Design a protein with these regions (language model features):
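Acidic, glycine-rich low-complexity segments with interspersed aromatic residues
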Residues: 1-49
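Compact mixed alphabeta submodule
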Residues: 44-94
Length: 94
């Protein structure tokens, strides 16, 4: 599950069946794309609201190939261009 490491750094997990070589994942590693970050409080939460957190960028050398339930998945750290608002940060992390 995605999680904040701080109010400006997010540890992100890709969708299942993604590898470091997947086109979708490769887009994170280039500055050709502007990354807009949206998040919901929890996958288990019945609330379907997404919160816009701002723009972000991939932190070099942070991507890792992992397995989840026997399926490939990629994790990486993303740095937000601006800190998440204090109240929104606590809403998403508490």
């Amino acid at each position: 599950e995605d999680r904040f490491l701080s109010d400006r750094i997010l540890h992100y997990y890709s969708k299942n069946n993604r590898k470091l070589t997947s086109k979708e994942v490769q887009k994170f590693f280039t500055d050709k794309y502007r990354l807009l970050l949206f998040m919901k409080k929890s996958d288990a939460d019945d609330n379907k609201d997404f919160y816009y957190l701002g723009t972000c960028s991939y932190i070099d050398s942070s991507a890792r190939q992992e397995n989840q339930d026997g399926k490939p998945i990629v994790s990486m750290n993303l740095r937000l261009d601006n800190r998440v608002n204090y109240h929104l940060y606590h809403l998403l992390t508490d």
